[in-house]
């Protein structure tokens, strides 16, 4: 066994902090305009009605209302916000 670590092993053992991605408001929840609904990398979930898409693919509410997740196409998902009647 080596009695010195060697160059490779001393450079490993680092990791980055988690990015706190995921769904922040679930289906059926009430949101206000500007609330973040999903933080994601790429458009895993696509924007539907009354939601905006940020430059980092964050989906956020444009109006006050209720969140609804919907399927469209064969294998895509979208999220919309509908006003409360």
Curated annotation (Swiss-Prot):
Gene3D superfamilies: 2.40.50.100. It comes from the Bacteria. The keyword Ribonucleoprotein applies. One of its GO terms (molecular function) is structural constituent of ribosome. The keyword Ion transport does not apply. Keywords: Ribonucleoprotein, Ribosomal protein. One of its GO terms (biological process) is translation. Transmembrane segments: none annotated. Residues 1-21 are annotated as: Disordered. One of its GO terms (cellular component) is cytosolic large ribosomal subunit. HAMAP family: Ribosomal_bL27 (MF_00539). Belongs to the bacterial ribosomal protein bL27 family. This is Large ribosomal subunit protein bL27. The gene is rpmA.
């Amino acid at each position: 066994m080596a009695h010195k670590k060697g160059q490779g092993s001393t450079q490993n053992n680092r990791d980055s902090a988690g990015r706190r991605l995921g769904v922040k408001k679930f289906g059926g929840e009430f949101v206000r305009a500007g609330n973040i609904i999903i933080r994601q990398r790429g458009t895993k979930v696509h924007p539907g009605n009354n939601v905006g898409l940020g430059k980092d693919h964050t989906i956020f509410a444009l109006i006050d209302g209720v969140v609804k997740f919907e399927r469209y196409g064969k294998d895509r998902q979208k999220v919309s916000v509908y006003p409360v009647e």
